[in-house]
Amino acid sequence: MVALSVFVRQQPKLSNLSFVTFSEFFSSIITAQRASYWGAFFIAVLSPGFLLGVTQPSHTHSVQNPIGTATLEIGTCDSNGLAGGTCYRAVVSGCPEASSDFAATVKINEPADLNSLKGTVFFTTGGSGQALYDYDQDFIGDSRCSASNCGLMTVQSINAANYRTVQVDFVDPEGVIQEPDGWLTGPATDGPRSLACRYATIVHAVWEVLLKRDKTHLVCATGNSGGGALLAYAITQYGMGNGSGPGPEFTMIETTSGPPYGRIDQGCAGTAAPVSTVSCPPGAQLSEDYGLTTAADFVDPAYSSDVCTVDINSNGTDPYPYFHHDSVLSDDDPAPSYKTFVRSLFGSEDLTAAVPLGLEWYNAITSSKSAACVTGAPHELPEDFDGASTIVTDITTTCK
């Protein structure tokens, strides 16, 4: 194997530093079991070295999250999905709050005519991202797509339009590193927000090493549900939407069916979660409540304990204190503005909390954006022929 290493790492600014003893203490507090949280807190404030009279926990956050480092090793693609690709094993290290290295598969397909290259498009799948877009079982089933694989149709059509396609699968291709929950494998104090560092680092590594920091051609991306959340975190918390991050700066992203982490604090609030009237499907009233299954599968694994499940069972009376901060629409950026054009798609058959939670973020964006409703499309929007066709049209007409 040929190893290509990326040594560029964005460092937090000095202005984000605080009193270390105090910060480290409370970072450890919020990783403890929730049942012992306040007991540990009151013991601490009565102990030597801590100030008396403090009544609220504190945790130091950076407005912009730093990325880690990555290596890319050339591997072998399997026979599924789009033929002619080159696959890499990406190993990410140094992401703050991630306790160990993380590995993922990166599959790249060059267009037939590189001289007519229009740009590069990244693809991520939903949930914990443990599949390539061109062979995700959730995107297979609509007979109107070739081989009933609409994910493959999407990638293939965009590649045929002279775009380089880059797919990310958050599973170690060598099976060495155990990642049961894909990119959401924790624990992390700041949950999905911190763990999205893995995606941002991989995107940067591909751009830095393989694309040679190419600023001549555009970089765009699409992702469904949790995969769309990775794009939203990248342009918001990792600076890839306004030039403040390590690069690249996305020209356009298309989130489909989300992002479901628009407001985690509201998604984990149980019956206290807001109910919104949405336009897709027209006039439907949808709760932002994740429900216990989604909480257990796609929120709790990012933390050190079942914090979302606990909050749902309490109907919002026992919240994890940093859910709002950990959201895409966070308390440190309530009115996001990007140089990146944001396009959001929803399906009329999607009645999940991802719709109103995704709209929480979309509606707060103050920069250039647009949204659309795909009639008949489910939450797994790229599984639907019309949904997949809309993605292809949007990217090939907007990413240019």
Identify the meaning behind each predicted range.
Residues 63-116:
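N-terminal cap/lid segment of alpha/beta-hydrolase-fold proteins
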Residues 111-158:
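Short, surface-exposed "cap/lid" segments of acyl-processing enzymes
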Residues 120, 159-169:
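A fold-wide structural signal in alpha/beta-hydrolase
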Residues 165-194:
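Cap/lid segment of the alpha/beta-hydrolase catalytic domain
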Residues 187-213:
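Alpha/beta-hydrolase active-site loop
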Residues 216-276:
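Primarily recognizes the serine-hydrolase "nucleophile elbow" in alpha/beta-hydrolase
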Residues 295-375:
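Serine-hydrolase catalytic core
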Residues 384-400:
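Catalytic active-site module of serine/aspartate enzymes centered on a nucleophile-bearing elbow/loop
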